[in-house]
């Protein structure tokens, strides 16, 4: 199984590349055929950038507050550099998105809106704004009610966004806790491995001592056997033959 942190880093890089392609496509459509561009496209692109920012912060927090005891200092520094690179990419992406949106706004001001305002004419209106067809039949109370309805919809959208962020936060905490548990298990395994290694080293030292003692014992036994053999030879006919002396004959 691959490293979880590196997998998350690769996923963020994919998100950045995907959003970069979306911004480029948005700019091309605004330049060539602005009529097919949806009005909520800038908001979607901005939300994508916010999501990437949150993912980078979560990845950065895992290095700052996570359990990194099993990561070497060199690898930890390399991962911090990767996060800095992601932040630079995100900032560049933010500048690109701002430029695309600002160019769109400036073009709309220069060229006019899609309701037939020609080149060189501003869509600025003086005096009372033109009433829309949707609110034309409303009285003051109905306008107030409609405005409250719009505000409630905006509040509901914000609540949904807040709930989504909270779910992501809870998921991040759950993954962090799970990683801590895995790290604790790995620490236990490492401690057990160290204990077994120490026992093996002690056993090897004992074996070496036994080998040395066995060698000394064998030498002593051999000397004793030789002495006994010499005594036996002297006390038997073999001694008489060896010395060729009647004194050594039984």
UniProtKB/Swiss-Prot annotation:
Q: How does it sit in the membrane?
A: Single-pass membrane protein
**Location of this chain's protein in the cell:** Membrane
Q: Which residues lie on this side of the membrane: Cytoplasmic?
A: 1-213
Biological process GO annotation list?
hypotonic response; intracellular protein transport; vesicle docking; vesicle fusion
Superkingdom of the source species: Eukaryota
Annotated signal peptide: none
* Vesicular topology ranges: 235-250
From the record, what ranges are coiled-coil? Answer: 73-100
InterPro entries (UniProt xref): Syntaxin, T_SNARE_dom
One GO MF term: SNAP receptor activity
Q: Which GO terms describe its cellular component?
A: endomembrane system; SNARE complex
- Principal localization reads membrane
Q: Which SUPFAM superfamilies match?
A: SNARE fusion complex
Recite the UniProt keywords alphabetically: Coiled coil, Membrane, Transmembrane, Transmembrane helix
What are the residue boundaries of the t-SNARE coiled-coil homology domain, all occurrences included?
148-210
Instruction: Tell me where the transmembrane regions lie.
Output: 214-234
Classification via PANTHER family: SYNTAXIN, SYNTAXIN-8B-RELATED
Q: Which family does it belong to?
A: Belongs to the syntaxin family.
Q: What is this protein called?
A: Probable syntaxin-8B
Q: Which organism is it from?
A: Dictyostelium discoideum (Social amoeba)
- Which gene produces this protein? syn8B
